[in-house]
Amino acid sequence: HFVDDNLMANREYAKDLFRHMAGLGVRWGTQTSIEIARDEELLDLAWKAGCRIVMVGMESTSQGNLEAVRKGWGRADRYRGAIRTIQGHGIAVHALIILGLPEDTAGSIDGTVDFLVEAGAAAAEFFLFTPYPGTPVGDEYRREGRIVDFDPTHYREPFVVFRHSQLSAAELQ
């Protein structure tokens, strides 16, 4: 048993590891970036090494949301093709999505679900956005008076500690 939250960040290291794991008969999954879809050799080696699922932190299917939380390096417009590429190598994609980002609306959340179904994601998991104190977004929300709950024990799901511009706390929960 081993754990690595960023197993494929160093692609050359991961490829070497996967070559050594091939043939062991171990089935496994990992967290990784959607960017692995750009490396066909890595995907082939991961599958041969037993990788059958990747949990991918897409966060949002809205480019504006990605930029708002400083993850603009992600490209929402490439997600559909990336999901298909990864799954075309026999590796299921488990999408990790954050709800309650700045541009989210009830319609955009429904659109995210529709997108994931149409793109063929094997699974999806949804998390509530939390603007933690001390982070740039958390500090920004505090300055704007959008933090409505300062209880540190509520900075986890299912609590909504901020006022969203378009969704109520009940809608987010």
What spans do the regions from the language model cover?
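A structural motif corresponding to the C-terminal lobe/cap of the Radical SAM core domain
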Residues: N6-E12, D16-Q173
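Active-site groove signature of glycoside hydrolases
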Residues: H1-V3
